[in-house]
Amino acid sequence: MLLASGVALAATFDGTPEPDTFVGSPGSDDIRGRGGGDNLSGAGGIDRVRGDGGNDSVSGGPGGIPDRRERVEGDTGNDTVSGDEGADEVRGHSGDDYMRGGDGADFIRADDGGIDTVNAGSGDDVVEAHEDAGKDTIDCGEGIDTVDFDAGVDVVADNCENRDPH
């Protein structure tokens, strides 16, 4: 929502058990799918976008704020979870998820079960992919990245500079 003065207000979007499509406002939004195969996207501001069940597509959307972390999350189901050009916290949760960080300094967590695929994108990223039995695949992209992973289980690309096998 935008006031006449040009100030962007935050909005809350709360979905249904059915498939929903939400695109956030220019302000900082809280978007939650609540079931179904949702398509959810933030748009400016510092957003929190959550899939909450179903096979969801969740993204931070365009216009994030550099150095201020947005939070984008899947949930149960096989989700696609993507950050944006700013700093993001990306979480897939359970299910076989595809997670992409984007251009900023991102924190990506792929350790809640399932077989996850991570593309950290550019920027100096931190990827946590340990504490689950799934065989995760991690590509760090550009930047100086740090990865905590399950040794002997996860597949970590050569472009991941700092590795911490568990």
State what each model feature region is:
Residues 1-4:
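Bacterial N-terminal signal peptides
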Residues 12, 29-32, 73, 109, ...:
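Short glycine-aromatic motifs
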Residues 15-17, 24, 33-35, 42-44, ...:
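Glycine-centered beta-turn/loop sites at beta-strand termini
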Residues 17-19, 118, 138, 156-157:
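All-beta strand scaffolds that present successive hydrophobic residues in beta-strands
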